[in-house]
Amino acid sequence: FYSINNMYGISTPIKSVINIDYNYQRASAYGVPGHFIEDGNDLLAVYNKFEEVVQYVRDGNGPVLVEAITYRWLGHSTSDPGKYRTKEEVDEWKKKDPIERFKGYLIENKIATASEIEAVEKASEDAVEESVKFALSSPEPTLESAFEDIFAD
């Protein structure tokens, strides 16, 4: 199980509604190990933790609960202006952008160059654009198709 803790339940700070410090601490009540990733915006920390727990599960040891602390930059929905957070709080978390941090890691460790990363980003944007064009030019699905490929009646 993976708990992505963005520190808010809609607009309520999580710390004000739970009686423990972190959700992963609940795991022991269910007899499963709980794991904590303090910086869920660090892709390598997340990868390394999941490499460990996936092997644990594949070895037949049962489930685990992993919690990662991260941040939701925008409101919970389009009707949520996010006024319960300060601009400073949001700006501080934006400095921890996982994509920008990982790009920096790749460049710093000479795994990829800035131009190689830009090429991957461009290819991804092009693929999304093509998918949108395909979706917009495709016929609307039929009502009957809503019931295709389901697992149970």
Residue ranges of each PLM-predicted region?
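Glycine-rich ThDP/TPP pyrophosphate-binding loop and its adjacent helix/strand module
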Residues: 1-137
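C-terminal intrinsically disordered, low-complexity extensions immediately downstream
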Residues: 137-153
